[in-house]
Amino acid sequence: MIRLRRGSLYRLLRDWIADGRGVAATEFAFIVPLMLVMFFGTVEFCSAIAVNRKVTLMARTLSDLTSQSPSVADADIATFFTVTNKIIWPYATGTLNPYFTSPSSGTISELYVDQTTKQARVIWSKGSAPRTADTYVTTVPSALLVPGTYLIFSEVSYQYVPTVGYVMAKAGVTLSDVSYTRPRQSSCVLYIAGTTTPSSPCPTT
């Protein structure tokens, strides 16, 4: 009797080990979560790359539109920001007031390269985080620091928040870029405050 039970138990164990039914379902259950993470991760990274490209286009557009004008007033700059803000669509656009903010932020500045020190100094600046006039921008590439010339300098950033927060941080990542252009219509782009036109053709101080 004991031998029979042992033999039956052995056969049951052997048959259980040899039984392949349900193996595929078990493997699939283990693989599905990994596949989902990879899928959503790919989608999020592709979206982030697309947004990053749009941020670059926003920075270039903002500086390019500004550099094509011989002079700008607050209304002109607000229009440039409005046009630039549409580039990020279909992703969330920034709130215009009059410069875009959250999730976008941007600043447009004119820089003057000092003839003596060859440093880029802020002449005027407008945007969601404008730079202080007469301060220096130290990140300008050396090839652009031509003494006595002007630069239109744009800065744009975007807070990209992923739809699924398993791959990227739920708070999102900040994507940013800058662009430099030369004034196209004149030596500099004059900023007109109110109705007063600056007396100096191109201010250096």
Spans of features found by a protein language model:
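Alpha-helical assembly-interface signal, strongest on the long, hydrophobic N-terminal helix that forms
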Residues: 1-90
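Short, conserved structural patches
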Residues: 2-3, 60, 67-205
